[in-house]
């Protein structure tokens, strides 16, 4: 009997240790935007559709109103390429503090433990990576040592010109390229600014072709 009690105690201890080793990450709330909620200001019909996943965390500076408004304001910047956001889901996660910051090894763990559809934009409290960027895009070409983060964007609280920054980083992911442009007022200039919103036909064509090939954009019916 004593041996059985000892074995049972050991089993309980091992189980408890295993449970505590797996961080508690759970979705606590979600919001949805349909195509009808997102502005389409272009005069020509959209050719490609984009579905986005947006992630915020409890107990951070980010709120749903800010992130959803930035997503709506970003939509016209993609429209010039014939790309329409056909759906966007914002999920709020409850997670241990370390996951609320962008740090490559920890964020890789988060992506493994709580996978979401891609492309995905994570709104975090700050970045702990060095050098530090307000926002960082990880495509497939630059995710070789961090495959869990492919097709994701990480945005720190306080990022300026948020809708422009989101469109800029999303374009990096869709085009699967870190290239920047020297053209005046181009969205892909190295520094984002309110006036940097334009894209050329050739930029749009490259982005659409790559994103469609990678399954991030879908052709819309005529």
Regions found by a protein language model. Give the residues of each.
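Short pre-active-site segment immediately N-terminal to the catalytic Zn-binding motif
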Residues: 148-167
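Sec/Tat signal peptide C-region and signal peptidase I cleavage site
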Residues: 15-17
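Catalytic zinc-binding patch centered on the HExxH motif and its immediate surroundings
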Residues: 109-115, 127-149
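Catalytic Zn2+-binding segment of zinc metalloproteases
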Residues: 170-185
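Propeptide-to-catalytic entry region of secreted or membrane-anchored zinc metalloproteases
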Residues: 19-119, 123-128, 220
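Stable alpha-helical elements in mature extracytoplasmic
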Residues: 66-73, 106, 162-166, 170, ...
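Bacterial N-terminal signal peptides
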Residues: 5-13
